[in-house]
C-alpha cells in the first residue's frame, strides 16, 4: 500500500477534473490549465519542505514535456534530463516518463530510457482516471523510481557524479 509520506504528498496535489486528451482541442486547454495548477502546487509544496527535485516545461500544445530531475545521494546532486509525450489516449493512458541519459543502464527501463512503471504505478493510475495528472505521475512514478534505482546505479558505478552544468549518467 501507500506509506504515510506518499499519502501526505498525494493529498497535497490537487486532483484534476477534466477528462480530456490532446485530441479534444477545447477541453484539452482546460485540462492543461488544471495540469499546470497541480504541477505548480506540487513544486511549491516540494520547495517549502526542502525536497525540490525537478523542473518541467512543455511545448505550446502541452503534448511534449521536458526538463531536469535530480537526486541527492551522499550530499552530491545527480541531475538527469527527463522527457515524455502525452499519449493521444491521455488521461486513460499514463505518460511514459523517460530519462534518456540512463538508457540501457538498468533492467528497470525500456528502450529509449523509459522507466518501468507497470507493476505499481499503472494500476493506481488506472483507478484514478481522470483525477491524476502529470504531477501525480512525477510523485508516484518518477520519484520512487529515482529513490530506488539511482542509489543502486551509483553503488554499481553505472552513474557517476558530474560537476555543475553536466548531466549525470
Swiss-Prot record:
Keyword Hydrolase: no
Protein name: Ubiquitin-fold modifier-conjugating enzyme 1
One GO CC annotation: cytoplasm
Originating organism: Culex quinquefasciatus
GO molecular function per UniProt: UFM1 conjugating enzyme activity
UniProt keywords, alphabetically: Ubl conjugation pathway
Residue numbers annotated as active site: 116 (glycyl thioester intermediate)
Functional summary from the UniProt entry: E2-like enzyme which forms an intermediate with UFM1 via a thioester linkage.
Superkingdom of source: Eukaryota
Family named by the database record: Belongs to the ubiquitin-conjugating enzyme family. UFC1 subfamily.
Stored PANTHER family: UBIQUITIN-FOLD MODIFIER-CONJUGATING ENZYME 1 (PTHR12921:SF0)
Record-level GO BP terms: protein K69-linked ufmylation
Amino acid at each position: 500500500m501507500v506509506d504515510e509520506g506518499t499519502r501526505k504528498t498525494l493529498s497535497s496535489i490537487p486532483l484534476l477534473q477534466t477528462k480530456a486528451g490532446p485530441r479534444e482541442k477545447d477541453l484539452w486547454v482546460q485540462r492543461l490549465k488544471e495540469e499546470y495548477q497541480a504541477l505548480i502546487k506540487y513544486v511549491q509544496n516540494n520547495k517549502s519542505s526542502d525536497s525540490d527535485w525537478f523542473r518541467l516545461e512543455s511545448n505550446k500544445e502541452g503534448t511534449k514535456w521536458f526538463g531536469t530531475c535530480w537526486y541527492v545521494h551522499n550530499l552530491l546532486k545527480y541531475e538527469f534530463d527527463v522527457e515524455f509525450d502525452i499519449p493521444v489516449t491521455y488521461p486513460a493512458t499514463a505518460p511514459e516518463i523517460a530519462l534518456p541519459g540512463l538508457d540501457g543502464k538498468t533492467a528497470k527501463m525500456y528502450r529509449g530510457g523509459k522507466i518501468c512503471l507497470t507493476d505499481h504505478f499503472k494500476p493506481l493510475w488506472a483507478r484514478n482516471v481522470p483525477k491524476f495528472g502529470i504531477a501525480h505521475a512525477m510523485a508516484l512514478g518518477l520519484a520512487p523510481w529515482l529513490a530506488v534505482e539511482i542509489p543502486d546505479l551509483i553503488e554499481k558505478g553505472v552513474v557517476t557524479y558530474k560537476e555543475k552544468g553536466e548531466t549525470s549518467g
